Regions:
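Active-site beta->alpha loop and helix N-cap motifs at the rims of alpha/beta catalytic domains
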Residues: 1-8, 13-143, 149
C-alpha cells in the first residue's frame, strides 16, 4: 500500500451528554474531504480514543466506514495498553473493511525494543492489512528504533 496525499487524524466530537456526536462528525468528514484530504484516521490520539469505551470505539469505526468508506482511504487507530486489545480492535477494523491500521507504542508501560518488536509482530500476525507504526516518543515515553522497523 502506498500512502499518497493528506490523511487526517480526525477528532471524535461529543455532545453535552458525552455521547459521540455523529452529526458533527459527518460535517467534519465532509469538510476535510471537500478540502483535499484523501484518508481518514479515526481512533487516534487526536480522536480521544483513550476516552472511548470499546463499544464506542467499534461504533466509531463502523460509522466512519459506512459514511466515508467509498470516499476515502481509512486507517483505524487501534492503540491500547494491552497487545491483546490492539489485536481485537485491529481484527474488528480489518473485518469492517479498513484499508490499514495505525498502531502506537503501548502507553504508560515504556516497553523496551524487544517488547515493542513482540507487540508489533503479534499484531501483524493477527491481521492481514498494512500497519503504520505510530512513533510518538513524547507521549509514549519510548521511541521505536530502526531495528524494530527493520
Amino acid at each position: 500500500m502506498k500512502l499518497r496525499g493528506v490523511y487526517a487524524p480526525i477528532v471524535t466530537p461529543f455532545d453535552a451528554n458525552e455521547n459521540i456526536n455523529y452529526d458533527v462528525l459527518k460535517r467534519l468528514i465532509d469538510h476535510v474531504l471537500a478540502n483535499g484530504v484523501v484518508g481518514l484516521v479515526p481512533g487516534g490520539t487526536t480522536g480521544e480514543v483513550y476516552a472511548l469505551s470499546e463499544s464506542e470505539r467499534m461504533d466509531l469505526f463502523k460509522f466512519v466506514k459506512d459514511y466515508a468508506g467509498t470516499k476515502a482511504v481509512l486507517i483505524a487507530g487501534t492503540n491500547s495498553g494491552a497487545t491483546r486489545d490492539v489485536i481485537r480492535y485491529s481484527q474488528a477494523a480489518a473485518k469492517m473493511g479498513y484499508d490499514a491500521l495505525m498502531v502506537a507504542v503501548p502507553p504508560y508501560s515504556r516497553p523496551n525494543q524487544r517488547e515493542l518488536l513482540a507487540h508489533y509482530s503479534a499484531v501483524a500476525e493477527a491481521v492481514k492489512i498494512p500497519i503504520a507504526l505510530y512513533n510518538f516518543p513524547w507521549r509514549a515515553g519510548t521511541e521505536v528504533s530502526y531495528e524494530v522497523l527493520d
